[in-house]
């Protein structure tokens, strides 16, 4: 689930297949494509995939029981595998494009460990954000402004509106409350 969001994919899917010794290598019984919406995050996409997985099994179980289901051999040369993600993979590099940081944040939001950066040598989690086309206002990681919508930070290309943030060990708050609570000023750098 995480990798398709990190990579900015627009579609994923679920596959019902036979179990064999190698992971995900068994004959395919059925598969379904699932569109990935711009606002989807890891949790919402997981729930979509869960729903489709139940539906695909419900539809195919009678055929499986009767031995009348499809058995399409997989072309393993076309398979792609991505390794597991580790919490440190959630570290934000502000030099990246705003859309890449957005994709990372939505890929590792709750219930996963979260995208994070540092401010004043303290870990800050970014739970919800939004890419904006505002560009060239400052160096990557620089706090450009904040208002009721959140905190606007410069990225390598474009900017990112931080909507829900959390200083490690503290409660989650909206970006504006975060800026107020920690007396942030324009020009501060997130690293």
For every predicted segment, state its role.
Residues 1-82, 86-88:
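Donor/substrate-binding cores of folate-linked one-carbon enzymes
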Residues 35, 91, 168:
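Short, flexible active-site loop motifs that bind/organize anionic cofactors or intermediates
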Residues 59-118, 125:
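Active-site-lining helix/loop region of Rossmann-like oxidoreductase modules
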Residues 94-191:
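An anion-binding loop in the catalytic cleft
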